[in-house]
Regions:
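Canonical helix-turn-helix DNA-binding module
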Residues: 45-80
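Residue-level recognition of specific faces of alpha-helices
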Residues: 32, 62-65, 71, 85, ...
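Basic, amphipathic "hinge/linker" alpha-helix immediately C-terminal to the N-terminal HTH DNA-binding motif
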Residues: 78-96
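Arg/Lys-rich, alpha-helical DNA-contact motif
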Residues: 94-132, 136
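N-terminal leader segment of winged-helix/HTH proteins
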Residues: 1-23, 155-156
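N-terminal helix-turn-helix DNA-binding core of bacterial DNA-binding proteins
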Residues: 16-54
Length: 156
């Protein structure tokens, strides 16, 4: 697997640093699976373990749990398919992830901090907060002088 998305790299980096709660962890698995499927057409236990920084048996255990909750269909050695419900959760998290990462990039906090904070916050923000943050980013980008002024101000 030569091409790796920025989102997968940021997930991997965040999971190198800290452990997260169960529901947050489930969302991260769904996010990684969706990203892998989009990138290469499928997701394997080994791929997931690499990006989540966990052992393949841990991935198998989580896949079984997500299968029981109807987020995906999993049969050992036969593949992983997200259900519509799993796709919805993954898509929601992926949208939040993109918006937060873009915001932290505007704040100019550095990629490492942006990745870590995005992974920490994406699971906990209200949808309205995300919508407003998207509007704010759009506003800032339509007024690049404000971003430039902020960057100059924050260097002081």
């Amino acid at each position: 697997m030569k091409k790796i998305s920025k989102r997968l790299e940021s997930i991997k980096a965040a999971h190198t640093i800290k452990k997260v709660a169960s529901t947050t962890r489930e969302e991260d698995y769904l996010e990684v699976i969706a990203e892998l499927v989009e990138l290469k057409g499928y997701a394997t236990t080994l791929d997931i373990s690499r990006f989540m920084n966990v052992s393949p048996p841990s991935v198998t255990k989580m896949l079984q749990k997500l299968d029981e909750k109807k987020y995906l269909e999993y049969e050992k050695y036969h593949g992983i398919n997200l259900t519509n419900m799993g796709k919805q959760v993954a898509d929601t998290i992926r949208r939040k992830h993109s918006i937060l990462l873009e915001f932290f990039e505007i704040l100019n906090v550095g990629q490492g901090i942006a990745n870590q904070d995005t992974e920490g916050l994406e699971h906990h923000l209200n949808p309205k907060t995300i919508r407003q943050l998207r509007k704010y980013i759009t506003f800032l980008k339509s007024n690049p002088k404000i971003i430039k002024q902020f960057h100059e101000f924050s260097r002081k």
